[in-house]
């Protein structure tokens, strides 16, 4: 198995060989390096670190089987009798890894449950809220809204930290899998972009519609086309908005859309299976880094490796994405 460069920061690189990780720390920023034959460039840094934000999505408390797709006879994955449910294993590992970074804020952007039940949401809040308290901001995803769950259905949320503002949007619609933004939400984001005195990171569950991947129709997987275009218009008009960060697809991906300049529209992979993804945002003066991270606990890595073969062996490449999808720098506009 070839090495997988999972994390590149301004001072750190983590390379996995299957479940085994090699970590280099105290590296110089913005520098081409040869690390045991692996060529990589660290991300830039600008001044002192102002804030750290972590994010996760698609944590799926209550799920018991993964890899199932209706109408497709592919292998599915479940834990053995007596083993802890895999969402418990994976989320405990992610929470521990996040806590070690001492984040100023944590954003969980949807699909916190498998079935949208109150019991599953309570368990999510026990695990994430129990560790992070009032540093936690969360919003529902389609796994909640499909079942008409209204907890987490705040249309907009705003949080201000040193060097950055966090804007969180509820993109989910009741009884519907794909995403939507109302005129009121877009107006609010436009107004926030106009008054913000620092970079704004925008979070939601559903990724943008990408015309390079899907034809124009209302049944797209992510945000419907008209709302995607309206969101792009707001970003184009408000340079304080530096990026949009979503989940939903269970992959790491970055999309550049016409009319949005160099604004990244990002998808962060799922917590619950391979590779066990979450992301860290390092905020500097006029510069924000997205640093992808993979779970580190042995039990979580074991489950992650077991599930890399999902979808007839196609899942690992899809879910992992490119290094440039996972780790990159965003200049304040």
Which ranges hold each PLM region?
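Acidic/histidine-rich helix-loop elements
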Residues: 57-89, 146-152, 174-181, 215-220, ...
């Amino acid at each position: 198995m070839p090495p997988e460069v999972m994390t590149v920061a301004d001072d750190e690189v983590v390379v996995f060989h299957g479940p085994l990780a090699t970590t280099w720390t105290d590296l110089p920023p913005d520098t081409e390096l040869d690390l045991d034959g692996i060529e990589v460039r660290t991300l830039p840094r600008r001044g002192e670190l102002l804030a750290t934000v972590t994010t996760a999505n698609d944590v799926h408390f209550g799920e018991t089987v993964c890899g199932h797709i209706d109408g497709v006879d592919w292998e599915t994955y479940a834990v053995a009798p007596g083993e802890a449910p895999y969402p418990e294993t994976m989320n405990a590992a992610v929470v521990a890894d996040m806590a070690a970074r001492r984040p100023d804020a944590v954003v969980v952007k949807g699909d916190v449950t498998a079935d949208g039940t109150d019991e599953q949401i309570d368990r999510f809040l026990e695990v994430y809220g129990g560790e992070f308290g009032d540093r936690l901001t969360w919003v529902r995803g389609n796994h909640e809204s499909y079942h008409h769950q209204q907890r987490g259905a705040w249309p907009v949320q705003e949080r201000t930290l040193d060097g950055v503002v966090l804007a969180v949007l509820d993109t989910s619609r009741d009884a519907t899998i794909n995403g939507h933004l109302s005129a009121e939400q877009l107006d609010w984001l436009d107004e926030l972009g106009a008054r913000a005195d620092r970079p704004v990171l925008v979070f939601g569950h559903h990724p943008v519609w990408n015309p390079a991947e899907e034809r124009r129709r209302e049944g797209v997987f992510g945000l419907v086309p008209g709302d995607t275009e309206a969101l792009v218009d707001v970003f184009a008009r408000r340079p304080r908005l530096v990026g949009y960060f979503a989940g939903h697809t269970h992959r790491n991906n970055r999309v550049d859309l016409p009319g949005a300049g160099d604004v990244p529209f990002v998808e962060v992979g799922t917590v619950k299976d391979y590779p066990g993804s979450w992301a860290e945002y390092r905020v500097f003066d006029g510069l924000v880094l997205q640093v992808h991270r993979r779970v580190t606990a042995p039990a979580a890595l074991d489950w992650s490796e077991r599930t890399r073969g999902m979808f007839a062996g196609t899942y690992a490449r899809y879910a992992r994405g490119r290094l440039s999808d996972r780790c990159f720098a965003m200049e304040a506009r």
